[in-house]
Design a protein with these regions (language model features):
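A short glycine/serine-rich beta->alpha loop
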Residues: 47-48, 75-82, 134-143
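C-terminal binding/interaction regions
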Residues: 1-28, 36-38, 100-163
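Catalytic-loop motifs flanking and including active-site residues across diverse enzymes
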Residues: 85-89, 147-150
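Short, thiol/selenol-centered motifs that function as redox-active sites or metal-ligating centers
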Residues: 54, 80-87
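Short, surface-exposed loop/turn motifs that are enriched in glycine and acidic residues
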Residues: 4, 48, 79-83, 95-98
């Protein structure tokens, strides 16, 4: 596939996720600790993050089953307001980490962060990142990197709370 065709595909993935956000909840109250999930053994936490540059905001709630790096991400929900890039990134994050172990998700987080900080010098590992590789082009626009990273920063903060 040509570079131009790949960029168009990546742009379409971002637009699709921005229009139909996976894992998004309509009301923040839907992120409140779920008694049924706690009874089922899920440990939950949430993080609210703000991009002070543009005003994007997101709250991410994660539910883990198990313990340590082998714990699995069995619950993921988010609520946010912001640009298409930050909202699409949250949707892709939902699809990328749901059902994975904490260890796997941390690898994805590190690869995503490295890709975005590369300013276009690193080719995304599509096999590991899946649709998150679509944000590779964002790395060429430093002001937009914070938008794409916002949900991932919130996710990382939740994992730190739960560890």
């Amino acid at each position: 596939m040509t570079s131009s065709a790949m960029q168009q595909l990546y742009q379409q993935i971002i637009l699709d996720h921005a229009k139909s956000a996976h894992g998004a909840v309509a009301e923040l109250s839907e992120l409140d600790e779920d008694a049924a999930a706690v009874a089922a053994g899920l440990r939950q936490a949430q993080s609210h993050q703000v991009n002070t540059t543009c005003g994007d905001e997101i709250t991410v709630r994660v539910g883990l089953s198990g313990a340590g790096v082998d714990a699995r991400i069995d619950g993921f929900a988010w609520r946010g307001v912001g640009c298409s890039i930050s909202m699409a990134s949250a949707s892709v994050l939902n699809d990328t980490v749901r059902g994975t172990s904490v260890a796997e998700s941390l690898v994805m987080l590190d690869l995503f962060r490295e890709m975005l900080r590369s300013r276009g010098t690193i080719e995304p590992d599509e096999e590991v990142l899946g649709d998150a590789a679509a944000f590779a082009g964002v790395s060429k626009y430093p002001a937009r990197v914070k938008c794409a990273m916002l949900p991932w920063v919130a996710f990382e903060a939740v994992l730190l709370q739960l560890s």
